[in-house]
Swiss-Prot record:
Enzyme Commission number, as recorded: 2.7.7.6
Name the record gives this protein: DNA-directed RNA polymerase 132 kDa polypeptide
Top EC class, one word: transferase
Organism of this sequence: Monkeypox virus (strain Zaire-96-I-16)
Assembly information from the UniProt record: The DNA-dependent RNA polymerase used for intermediate and late genes expression consists of eight subunits (147) kDa, (133) kDa, (35) kDa, (30) kDa, (22) kDa, (19) kDa, (18) kDa and (7) kDa totalling more than 500 kDa in mass. The same holoenzyme, with the addition of the transcription-specificity factor RAP94, is used for early gene expression.
Amino acid sequence: MKKNTVSEMDQRLGYKFLVPDPKAGVFYRPLHFQYVSYSNFILHRLHEILTVKRPLLSFKNNTERIMIEISNVKVTPPDYSPIIASIKGKSYDALATFTVNIFKEVMTKEGISITKISSYEGKDSHLIKIPLLIGYGNKNPLDTAKYLVPNVIGGVFINKQSVEKVGINLVEKITTWPKFRVVKPNSFTFSFSSVSPPNVLPTRYRHYKISLDISQLEASNISSTKTFITVNIVLLSQYLSRVSLEFIRRSLSYDMPPEVVYLVNAIIDSAKRLTESITDFDIDTYINDLVEAEHIKQKSQLTINEFKYEMLHNFLPHMNYTPDQLKGFYMISLLRKFLYCIYHTSRYPDRDSMVCHRILTYGKYFETLAHDELENYIGNIRNDIMNNHKNRGTYAVNIHVLTTPGLNHAFSSLLSGKFKKSDGSYRTHPHYSWMQNISIPRSVGFYPDQVKISKMFSVRKYHPSQYLYFCSSDVPERGPQVGLVSQLSVLSSITNILTSEYLDLEKKICEYIRSYYKDDISYFETGFPITIENALVASLNPNMICDFVTDFRRRKRMGFFGNLEVGITLVRDHMNEIRINIGAGRLVRPFLVVDNGELMTDVCPELESRLDDMTFSDIQKEFPHVIEMVDIDQFTFSNVCESVQKFRMMSKDERKQYDLCDFPAEFRDGYVASSLVGINHNSGPRAILGCAQAKQAISCLSSDIRNKIDNGIHLMYPERPIVISKALETSKIAANCFGQHVTIALMSYKGINQEDGIIIKKQFIQRGGLDIVTAKKHQVEIPLENFNNKERDRSNAYSKLESNGLVRLNAFLESGDAMARNISSRTLEDDFARDNQISFDVSEKYTDMYKSRVERVQVELTDKVKVRVLTMKERRPILGDKFTTRTSQKGTVAYIADETELPYDENGITPDVIINSTSIFSRKTISMLIEVILTAAYSTKPYNNKGENRPVCFPSSNETSIDAYMQFAKQCYEYSNPKLSEEELSDKIFCEKILYDPETDKPYESKVFFGPIYYLRLRHLTQDKATVRCRGKKTKLIRQANEGRKRGGGIKFGEMERDCLIAHGAANTITEVLKDSEEDYQDVYICENCGDIAAQIKSINTCLRCSKLNLSPLLTKIDTTHVSKVFLTQMNARGVKVKLDFERRPPSFYKPLDKVDLKPSFLV
């Protein structure tokens, strides 16, 4: 879209965010945060994690220690792009090496003596192999161990080795706000987690729980399993902060409702009673006694002083380097929230709110794995040293332990859908279309097991915290993922930050806070606590909070702190806190700034004239107070106006209540929803269904499909959509196409296109309309001896193989053809046989219903021969294939009509597709009609006044009235043909045409809606789903049809189908289908005495039960199905006796004859 199509300033500013910003290093906005996350991990974070120096073991009161040091960490990313990697045939990944030194430190009078135990210099380039966003496999296609056919230059893209398959961004389990829970009436808990900052490695986690029972206020304790003592929360706060109980009372009661003040007084009084119950109470002695009791309880091998230091020093790891007094004031602030939340739960962020969670991006996945595997690696070394010392008396390490850090296996498991050992599996996502390459990395969801374990059923609802940051339309409509996966809106991203940047930013913020007068930031009794990533740094004078937050936001926008994504949240509503967030994993998006009741875009008139030549980073630099990056925490506790139009309609006093203003509605959708048109003009469910169908649309992949041995469906003749949105254009979804323009007619056609049925023109199909090509990977593993077996096999399945045992290039595979030689030979134990060796074919066959051409063959020779075959097939639309518009008007091909059968207009043009007209009324998709009208108007005037092509802007969610679009179409037609009459102009605008009956050549009485639209073909194809068959494979046990279409399975003809035929009186058909044909009937002998199935011993049938009792059984032969016999046998094996009994009635030929009276009738 060109410049002159945008008129509103807020819309133009939103568009500036979507386009690339090379000055800020943003070349592709939708996935920029993923690229930054991964590059930060590879270039910086991995080096920090692997650089380790710490003790493994300690002896003799810590005077002797076994130390480990990992140094010389070298991470080598590739010097070329993924495309160059493909041309070179290289793998696009990063390699890491390091050196491990293990030595013994002994503390002597002269100093510390060091004795080397073992070392390993990791020179192997594959010691740690980190897959990047794209993985090109097999190193070099010319390698003799692995060969390709055709053997040409070009890498082979293997999707399973790519990080693209990782899938959605998971929501962290740890919450940044404490979790409030009602255990039972009058019993509550307040749980929170403390995580060490990123510069502290290894990362320390502590989880605490504050319990409060109204009936036992003395037991208002804080506890943590094995990491902290169980102690009264008020007394702990007093111990750490060194203040009186009256100070704590005043701090908790300040600015609280009366009901909360009453509870505060009760808790403080209970703490006083607890202290008075102990003779000569001293807070230090009380805490020391609890620590000693915990030391005895845990049977710790540490000394009491070491145990106490370990417990209290590591209390609240996120405030590790903070004085204990600040830790005490932090506990008081937590207790304030807890007590307030008991009475006003709805005002506190619940556990399902996105305010409470951070999000794991792709780089964070691998960072977490690197942490865990490094600890496992060091633990294995420690255990090996202990075992060697125990068994041999020496401190030594096996070289195998040093050379297997285990990171490669963990990374491979991640790409297979295994994140952590304790978290179970999650679904991986192969990316088959350009739209999925964007939508999946921008999806946010929960752990699959997280919902089950935590019983978090409420997360399935659309949470208010997701508003503006998540797309409300692109959510799963069915299945286990409903409500658990959300799509980011086009303006949303996830923050990333380096450790060095984190420390510098924290230092600058602390210096800014301490620049205030000392007394103003030391209001610990009645002030507002200021926290940086939940770490308390100061407490501000309540009279200065507004000025502080306003000044902080202004300095942030001006670049004073060097980071524009800092979040500052002013939490009022009696909880009284100023939260400053700087960490990674936060959701952020831009907002328009409102300062003192003025929209800053209105205060900067020169911005409009310069906007066209500026990037988004230029706007942030030269006009810093126009736009602010706001995280979801700050947004939740700020006053945000819905739109600029509503803001300008308010009075001056109302405007001063707002802090921010949102962009137009189109920026609240995700990229998938942006591919739709006018969803606000349709019914609500159409948006959700439309997003699901758009992701199933067949598009054109950018990677080389001939070199990519992977499944995929590709549109052969794609067209760029005419009616688009800015997000669709900037994300390159429009340029990479996902459909074609077709001419549709909304009408009934001979009763064929009922419901979702559509009529498609035969000549349109023959010209390549919506034609696709299917690329499919077939992979088989063959034992090496079977592959090299040269025995002849008479099987017709080998007719497409060459002499090397592989399928020929350009061969057309049919169902039953083998893709590689797999002949198994067996020797018979028969001395009299002339040829006692037999061979038989065990190869896997091609099972698809359609023929495919062999495009590429790859072989990997190891202990087994792995053969990968890439087949291609052009597939034109057939009956049963699914199509849809971008307004969720799906249709299934019901009839393929010849052009002579279709109605035509005055120019002889026939529709390509006929859609049932009643579907518009039932599904209320008005925007589909608007799309047709706009597309037709574009065809009349495709260029603007400067001669440039201009697509039509029709965003997915827009605030433009339908009349405005009608006026646009009217101007297009008046410009191209100014002599049109009013009726002709109206018909042109509303795409109404008179069509002629092909049989009578007479016009229809009513006009028909007739025009072009962008039509999508879905990946639901008939030949991929068909499973019904008459003959095929069966299982060995019950001889039923196999399950699954890929295994040649079919649909079982069972009881319900039988009942249908019985109802129609088809007794013979039932017998043939159920017994003779499908289930293989079998003769069975039944004992009439006991009802058992007779056993066959040396070709003699006998009843085992009766023979043991010396009875003479009477065996009766019946015919039944094989599966019935298997069922009875299995039931008997489980101790369940099923007796087959016979109906006792005399046969008809033994019945006495009726008496016949032979007397003449006249004598009677």
